[in-house]
Structure formats: C-alpha cells, structure tokens
Amino acid sequence: MRVGLDIGSTTIKCVVLNDAGQIVYSTYERHFSHILEKGRALLEKVAAEYLPDGRAYLAISGSAGMGLADSCRVPFVQEVFATRVAANRLTPGTDCIIELGGEDAKILFLTNGTEVRMNGSCAGGTGAFIDQMATLLKMGADEMDKAAQSATRTYTIASRCGVFAKSDIQPLINQGAQAGDIAASIYQAVVNQTIAGLAQGRPIKGNILYLGGPLTFSRTLRQSFDKTLGVTGTLPENSLLFVALGAAFYADEESDLREVAKRLDNYSAAATYVSLPPLFADQQEYEAFHARHMKATVPCLPFGADCGPVHIGIDSGSTTIKLVVIDNNANILFESYRPNLGNPIPLVKETLLKLYRDHPGLQIASVTTTGYGEELVKNAFHCDRGLVETVAHFTAAKHFLPDVDFIIDIGGQDMKCFKIEDGAISNIFLNEACSSGCGSFLQTFAQALGYDVKEFAALGLFADKPVDLGSRCTVFMNSSVKQAQKDGASIENISAGLSISVVKNALYKVIRASSPEELGRRIVVQGGTFYNEAVLRAFEKEMGVHVIRPDIAGLMGAYGAALYGKAKAGENARSTVLTEQELAQFSQKVNTVHCQGCGNHCQLTVNVFADGKRYISGNRCDKPVTGKANNEDLNLYAYKLKLLDGYRSTPAPAAPRARIGLPLCLNMYELLPFWHTLFTRLGFEVVVSPFSSRSLYQSGQATIPSDTACFPAKLSHGHIHWLCEQGVDAIFYPCMSYNLDEHLGDNHYNCPVVAYYPEVLEGNCPELNGTRFLYDYFNLERRKDFYKKFQQSLDKYFPGLDKKAVREAIDAAYDEYHRHMQQLRDKGSEIIAAARAEGRRIIVLAGRPYHVDPEVNHGIDQLIIRQGAAVVSEDSVSWHEQKFQTSVLNQWTYHSRLYAAAKYCTENPDMDLVQLVSFGCGLDAVTTDETREILQAGGKLYTQLKIDEITNLGAVNIRLRSLFAALEERREVQAPLALS
C-alpha cells in the first residue's frame, strides 16, 4: 500500500493506493492551521482502517508539509515534483499545468524540461482571493460560480490584492451592477492575474491541465481560462489530489504509520522563535491602561421630546453605514452602525423612518453626509451638505483633543492618517498598495485559526512572548504564522504578534515614518480596529506616548459630520431632508449606461428617485449632468493629447518609401514629434498606434514577462501587437539611456524601464518575428554622433538614404521637438495666467510624459478640473527653476522636472502639486520622499496618487477633495498670502 499526504496552506489531502495503484481512500479538508493534530488523526485513521500491520510506503508534500515531514522523520517530496510525477503517470502528454491553491498559484511548463512559475509577493488571484470576493457578494463559492454563468458583461477588477479588488467591486455593488456580471468579472481578473503575473510572456499552449480547488470547483473559472487562452483545458479526475497522488507514487520508504503518528503526538517544539516584549507587564498595568481609555467618552443621553433641534451625521463607508444623532451640546442621542449590504439607501431610509416614528415632532436642524456614498445619500434624501471624510474625522478628533497634531484611522480595509499643523491638515496618508495594516487583516487570521475576532484579540493581551512577525502581505503572513507554530509559539503569542505587526505596517509601510517622533505627540486614534486593545496597546508602545481612543472610535466620521453640520447650521435652522411622508413614498431605481459624450466613455450609474430627481455617478466630467463638458481651456493634459493626436492625422507622402510604426507608449509620448518628423521628412508613411485602451492592453497581456513592471510598460505590449496587426514594414522603438539634457539635474538618464524596454519587447513578443523591429541604441543629446549613428542604423534596413537628406531630416526633427516643448510651456503659462485672473487654484499634475495617456491616468485631470482648479504638467513649469541641491542623486530627467516643479510650487501660493505614481515604479520609492520633502519645506501639502490598471476612482476623488478641503481650511486659518 502507498500513502501520500499533501499539506497545503489551507487544506490537507490524503490518498491511500492499493498495489494496483487504485485509490482506496482519499480525503480533502481544511486544517485551520492545526497541522500536527490533523496529520496525526489522519495517519491513525488510515493505519486502523486500511493497513492491518500499519505499514505502507509514505511520503509527504505540500507548501506546509516540510515541517511535518521533519517532525515525524518521513520522506518529503517537493510539490512541483510531486505534481509532475502524477501528471506523467496519469495524464501523459501534458504540456502545461495551471494550479491554483488556497494562497498559492503555479504554472508548470512540462515541454522541453520542467519550468515552474509561482506567485511571489502577492496572493491576489488565488483561492483565498476568490473566497474573499464571494463573501463580499454574500454568496458561497458555489453560488458565485452559478451566478457567473448568467453574466452578460464583465467589468475591470484588480486581482492584485483582495482589498483593492473590494474597492473595485464595492462601488459596482453600490451602483446596482448584476451579481452575475461581478462574479464573472472576478473570475476574469483571476485569469488575467495568472496569465500576466505567472506566465510572464511564455505562451500557454498545447495540452493544458487544470488543478487545485478553485479550478476544480468553478466551471466559470475554467471557461474563462479556455476563452482567454483560446484552448480547451482538461480537468482530470481527482484534480484536488494530484500532489498527494504524486507523493504516493514517489514514496520509496516503508513506514509504520502508527509509529509516525506517535512521533507527532510526542512532538513538542521548543519556543525558538524571535519574540518581542509582552504588551503588559501584569494585570495592574492593563487595568490602568483600560481605565485611562474609558475617559475619552461622549455623553449618550436619552432621546426624548425635550431634546430640541437635532443634527444628524451619516457616514456611508465602503462596507458599513454609520449614523449619529446629536443635540445642540454635541451629546449623542442615537447611533447606528450596520453593514451596508452593497446599497446604503434602503438602510438610511429605514433608519430615518424609525427616527420619525419613534420621536413624533422631531426637529432636524441639519443632516450632513460623508464617506464613499456621501453624494448618493445627500442627493437621495435631500440632505443639507456633504463633507469629505478626512475633514469629518478631523472635526471629530478636535472635539476630543483640540490641539491634536496626528490622527490615525484604521478601518476594516482602509487606513487614513492626517498630520495637523497650525489647525489645518498638512498631510494625508492612505494605504494604496497593501491592506496588511487593516482590520480585515486580523479578521482573516482569526477566522483561519478558528476564532471570533474579538476573542482572538483578547488572547494576545497577556501573551508572554509575542511573535515578531514583521509586517507583510495578509496572505504571506500565513507562512510566518505557520513557521511560528512549528517553532512552538502559542495562539496567544501569535495573536499579540499580529496586533503588533498591524501597527508596524501602518507606521512604517503606509506612513513610511523613519521614527515615531516625527508623527506627533498629541494623537487621536480612530476606526473599529482600535477597539482591539492589543492593537491600541501596541500602538502606544511603538509611539512611546499615550493616545486618545474615543469610545466612539468606529463612529467618528458620522460624529464629525454631525458636529460640522451643527457648526454650519446657525440659529433656528431647519433641514431640507425628506419628511416622514416623503420617505414613505421614497423609491430608488438604478441602471448603468455608457456615456457617449466624449472619448472617456465613462460607465455611468444613474439613480432615479421617486420625486424624479436623478443622481449620476461614475462621470469624470460634467457633461452627463449639465450637458456641458469640462472646460478644457484650463487643462494642459487635454492640450497635450490634442497636440499628439495632430501627428496621427499628418498626410502620408504620395509614394512612401515604407510604412513604419511608432508605438505610442513610455517615452514616445515625449519624442513622438521628433521621430514622426524625422521619418516623414525621409519619405516614410508613419503609422502611430492609438492612445491606450483596455482592449489594447488585453491584446498584448499574454506577452508581459513580469508582473512587477509598471502599468505603462505593460501597455507597450498592446501597442506592438496593434502595429503588427496593421501590417507595417517595420516598427521603430529605440533604446535610449539618455534624454536631452535640460540642466536641471546631475545627469539626464531615462529610468531603466523606459530606456531598455524595447529589448524586453523584442524578446517576448512573438508577433515581431514577422516584422522588422528597429530598437538600436541612440543618444539625442550627442547630436553630432546621432547623425552618424542614425544613418548607419537605417542603412541596415533601408539602404540608399541620402546623407544630406538624413541630416536635414534630423535637423527638422530637433526643431520640431523644441517647438513642441515650447508650445507646452507657453500653454502652461497661458493657463496659469487665466486661472489667476479667475481666482482659481492651479494644480501641477506631475508625473512622466506617458501619464498623459488616458488609460494610465484614468481621467484624473478631469476630476481636478471638476473641482474648479486649473491643471498644468510638470514639464510646463520646471523650466522656471535652475538646478538646485537635492538630498538624493538627481540623475533622471523626468524626476529632475518633478523636483523643479515642486520647488516652483513652493514659490507660488496659488499652486499645489499632485504626484502621479505608477504602481510598481521602483524609482518612485525615492522620488516620492524627495518631492514630499521639497513641498513640506516650502509649507505645501504633498498629495500622491498611485495608479495602475485599476479604474475605480473613488479613493482618488476622496484624496483630491481632501486636498482642496485642507487648502480651504488653511486659507481660513491663515491670512491669504500675496501672489509673487
């Protein structure tokens, strides 16, 4: 008999084979991290029921199996090898295996030797991710699969991280999208993540095998893979057990299973892990801590007829709805905290009706809304005002600590931090790349270990040796936890370690503080996560100060909104909110349409209410609402696109020498005027790829070799694919280490991705095999060399070009480039002058030349225009500055412009900078800190927007509105500065 055990990140699988290789017993169950106990129970059961003498050939495999194999001295077989053994035996001729597990994803290429690709730093697109999404849709995994079968369309959803997929999905739920469409979109996101992130440019073809839980249980997921890959994959019998079967086939050592189980029973690891000091020295210290935090309270009074006028604050969050009623003395009369179940409107209606019915004659002086659903709730119920959530939280914090200088709010899946200087918000931090410092992080672990989250948190309070877990992705922290368990850590010490890691992640990953002291000394902590006393204590210990944790930590947004409404309402105010009679007649209808008003083609959600009032969301300009588009006269991004589009409509020569393609990506956004002019003058017909789109991105997705490349680089694969489909004679996309020197920095390099990505395209785009691809190295700064180098390069492909004609074409190209850049500078100056004449704020939307691509910036420029500001770019103002000293090596042209633009903003009171950062950009780890320092040294706010393929702009909108609210607040606090 043969026995194979596969212990994965979330499940344990076991197979028993008879001498003919047939399965006589198999099991597949979750282990909830109780690996030793489950393993022992399985071995005892198999020995008792299937092995009369207790002996069998035994091997163990799986991502969590090595520790168990070591503990009981049994052979361990690596899971990739076990999978290959099983595939060779059971499905010979397999070319490729796609396996999705609970927290890991793998692609095994078996043709021409074995090659394996596994997920590295992120567990998006795995079984755990699908489970999270099913929970969000209030479905089981089976129900989600069934719902997806009825889908009629798909939406763009990030599978990079469960939390950020939530930020894409939650608005769709709120906007009334069909559950089946969302479910199908989730499966498609998993497919995209697997192909782009794991295949890394290697084609997936031939006989394909699907393995692992998600692919076994979801027919829709298999169909999505089949459709995207253009093949029909096979789901083999016993697909869940392949690794266990491989281990059983591989086993070459006979073991006594009863003896092995006994070894596990006697196994007790010494506590050898790295530990941290306990949260509390003793019970007395805890009681003093508990008593101190019970003082930050808001009086809650009975809600009677004599309460007078009341003020209501409604915080419509991404997953919850909070409502607070206060009197004129800021006492709480009523509070409500409920999950919004995807649509806040019915819950708000229900709560308002309850207030009217329970309190006849109720006088409502003001209703103020805040949060993600602020505008929707405000418009639906005719509330008096909306308030951006950062200001709502700040207003509430000031009530508890008037001279507060730092606020941190940790919710279930988001984190907000504000620095306060001179009574106004001076800096805002949001988690943009990872959720491992949020409440859902602890909840995930509590559930995985079989505990309620409150019970789990309480376990850690008196842990004697908390595990040092560092701060990592939610999913990959699991491996740290398993290792700690193997090393003898108790559940109590793991709970305490996780609470400490939440705090460290918030401070050092999100805020990126170099030391706790720089954040502040008068701190208010908010959000539901701080009800967890272990997290609260860990935060105080890490910061070295006592903090204020209000007893309404989870209601601070709603409370702040109510306070703000009270302050603005004035004497004898009466709210415009719907009356009891109007609420009884209230109804809401939701439908989604694509706006055809401009090239953005925004997906609009139209809410129609019983009184005929409409609320439209999802629009990036005002055209769907007012019938008029945004005023593009004050938008330099729109002007840049218009100039670039002009080159596409240039007529081709009558008898072109050849058709040459230019991919409009990365540095081509800056150098298109140069190359287009050069080739046109030489008699070529120039074919320029279009501005990027979702479909163009997906057309090149299969050839992307690494998921770590920035989104603008990934887009270039689609541009190459498009040009090849046009049948051009050649594609020209040179490698360029250097830019033209603008004398703003110590050197004038391109970043490595921009400089050398043509090499990556040449090596990974099979369609280039049928098209000449010209990607020689050029340096435009060395003009004399360039004449010669360019002539030599072109002669290889198009011999016989006249030297004089080439020189004249090059001279014309330089002239056109300089003319184009001067046009941008002149237009920037014109916009700034016009904005000043109208008293508008001016935002320098700073990034790289390719951030003007609509698919990259997602219309963020339009959002800023909607706030009533003007938009210019970094290259339209950087020329005002001379080279200056920076604290980092200033050697990249695009970054030199960024630093110069930041400095220019500090010299102009009506200008502020918003930095666009592409997710995954390594150099921006440096530039963001330097830009922040330059701006803060000049008394300016720093705002960073991280962007990639995610198109939902809810968080971006909040960020921008927070900036404008903070600027307005500063203007009120300080006397206005005179313009220089």
Residue map of PLM features:
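Acidic, glycine/GT-rich loop-and beta-edge segments that sit at the periphery of enzyme/chaperone cores
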Residues: 106, 253-309, 416, 567-632
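Conserved phosphate-binding/catalytic loops in two-lobed NTP-binding clefts
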Residues: 76-80, 226-245, 384-391, 540-559, ...
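Short glycine-rich, Thr/Ser-proximal phosphate-binding strand/loop in the N-terminal lobe
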Residues: 4-45, 115-116, 120, 314-354, ...
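Glycine-rich phosphate-binding loops at beta-strand->alpha-helix junctions
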Residues: 64-65, 198-228, 239-243, 370-373, ...
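Glycine-rich phosphate-binding loop plus the immediately following alpha-helix
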Residues: 34-35, 112-153, 240-243, 249-253, ...
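Glycine-rich phosphate-binding/hydrolytic loop that grips phosphoryl groups
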Residues: 85, 127-132, 237-271, 395, ...
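An N-terminal assembly and electron-transfer interface module characteristic of large anaerobic redox
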Residues: 119, 123-130, 329, 434-442, ...
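Adenine-nucleotide phosphate-binding core of ATP-dependent small-molecule kinases
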Residues: 165-196, 479-508
